[in-house]
């Protein structure tokens, strides 16, 4: 029996070695369960729509009307291309590279006790997960727990947990089944095609944590200098556990008008800032949970910004009533900030890995970014306009200072999660990506991506957002989106990125 187990593992290992030298990070598989074709259809539909819009746009310069990128944006993306190449080289040169992308596979069919129990779920009872998603996770059998671990990505341990839902098949296996057949069943139930897909995901995750490290490392060093602290125990998320529940649920507008937009329509993941983590791991050992397959990588980047405290690092909300008189509730500014960064960076990773599989040249990368980023910027503004339209509002309604207009608009606006930050503010910011990056260069004293913490940071950000409300190019494009009919495929989606 031990001999057969040994032979099986050798064959399994050879499968990975055979593919290792030419890892293709392209996530476009034939996987019907996750239906990546829907993502491609969305991007293709909007891209075609965008081309039509350009003929009618009144924008100029680097706006969506011309589809051009500024020199600053081009320079930023060129720098990120070099960082992604460095991440690629680091991962391939790492002595533990092979073991880091070969998972431990734990069979869990018929044994819920064998599943991992993230501390956040135990403590917070799955925040932001709708009953539809929690019911799905309760009723759909998780057949395998795949655990990947990279112990040293620039000093950080990154542990990836993928909860795999297999195909049908019932009944528990007989207790007399041999160990070798049990292992063989485990591997075959998680198809090699799916294992290859998961491996590409994990590789991209590792590259992300290599990429983001310098920005957060500068934060730690600066804070330690300011506080005269060099104690390694204070380091943020030295170990981070990432839990992926790849449920098939899409973010969609309600079919019937009048329903308040909430977690079912917008949320995909959650975490705590490392310094506020109430779990047993404290600041050093933290968690991020992703509970949809849709836009999972963009959401990981969003949650990482929160987790590593690259945002304003405050739960205090900000009143925007003097900028948007119709918005009477206070807003979490960090949500708009990190969502904007996640969408901008998502384009860099999408082009590098999903289009070219990590093998594109600088020229190919720059050309693809020049095509993808303008579409992303326009899509963000389109989603902003569409979200307000669902509530019977226009952008001019929410910025109009007239008391009668703002009061009428305030009665129409309703949310049960951070809709305004995710869609309206982030839509404005991504559309004005060049201005946003210039603002980060001038106002973020620690690093490009590290926001100034606390009220000072949110006040500066509020001033910047207020200035964007007067941007004529953006206002002209908002009017265009309000009047130009979109393809039917785009009417209901609440996804936040065109490319994923």
Task: Give the ranges of each region predicted by the language model.
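Short, hydrophobic/amphipathic alpha-helical patches that form generic packing surfaces
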Residues: 203-214, 336-351, 386, 414-438
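Active-site recognition of the HExxH zinc-binding catalytic motif
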Residues: 298-311, 342
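Auxiliary, metal-adjacent structural segments of Zn-dependent hydrolase domains
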Residues: 97, 101-168, 188-219, 231-281, ...
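Intrinsically disordered, low-complexity regions enriched in glycine and serine
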Residues: 25, 31-37, 60-66, 168-186, ...
